[in-house]
UniProtKB/Swiss-Prot annotation:
A Pfam cross-reference name: Peptidase_C26
Identification of the protein by name: Putative glutamine amidotransferase-like protein YvdE homolog
Originating organism: Lactococcus lactis subsp. cremoris
Top-level taxonomy: Bacteria, Bacillati, Bacillota, Bacilli, Lactobacillales
Span of domain Glutamine amidotransferase type-1: 17-188
Disulfide pairings: none
GO CC annotation terms, alphabetical: cytosol
GO terms classed as biological process: polyamine catabolic process
Xref: Gene3D superfamilies: 3.40.50.880
Keyword presence, Mitochondrion: no
Keywords carried by this UniProt record: Glutamine amidotransferase, Transferase
CDD domains referenced in this protein's UniProt entry, alphabetically: GATase1_2
Molecular function, one GO term: transferase activity
């Protein structure tokens, strides 16, 4: 089975919260669990200096980009909208470097939530900085529905590298940003 490198999420701390004095990279246990249940080994890769991705990439067969804070609109040529949430330029730079390195090494990439949005931006796409700027009929914010309850359907095109994913299933969503213009070579 494969070794999956999940790019960590920085824990942006505030004083008096756990770890406030240290930077922490983490991932949700559910990401680890799902890949382990499928027989894969998981390594969580810390957000680091962009030049260090070359040291991590040889350790994994595939990478996963997870959710988190908003993708900076500067990356797709827009000014911040009033509804833009927190961004993380260090994470943006590191994950963009990871995408570039993985593509150059022909390693598959799975983008989930923010990860998918960043992949779109990498390929020249843009985002709606907030759902209020689009007419989407999909419920992207779950409240008051519990987080673990799926609320909408998705379909996944079968690719050899991620054939373990089902073709059709339901997912939950916590987005307030969505794809506006699809990146070059991507399919919706």
């Amino acid at each position: 089975m494969a070794i999956i490198g999940i790019l960590g999420t920085p824990y942006n701390t505030v004083e008096r919260s756990p770890f406030w004095w240290n930077k922490v990279s983490y991932t949700r246990q559910s990401f680890i669990d799902v890949f382990q249940e499928l027989g894969h080994t998981v390594i969580v890769l810390p957000v680091d200096k962009t030049e260090n991705i070359k040291n991590y990439l040889p350790l994994v067969d595939k990478i996963v980009l997870t959710g988190g804070v908003d993708v900076s609109p500067y990356l797709y040529g827009e000014e911040p909208h009033a509804q833009l949430g927190t961004t993380d330029p260090i994470r943006d730079r590191f994950e963009l470097a990871a995408i570039k390195a993985a593509l150059e090494a022909n390693k598959p990439i799975l983008g989930v939530c923010r990860g998918l949005q960043l992949l779109n931006v990498y390929f020249g796409g843009t985002l709606y900085q907030d759902l209020s700027l689009t007419s989407s009929q999909i419920k992207h914010l779950q409240s008051p529905t519990p987080q673990e309850v799926p609320t909408h359907h998705i379909s996944v095109e079968k690719e050899d590298s991620f054939r373990f994913l089902p073709e059709n299933y339901m997912v939950n969503s916590f987005h307030h940003q969505v794809i506006k213009d699809l990146g070059q070579g991507l399919q919706a």
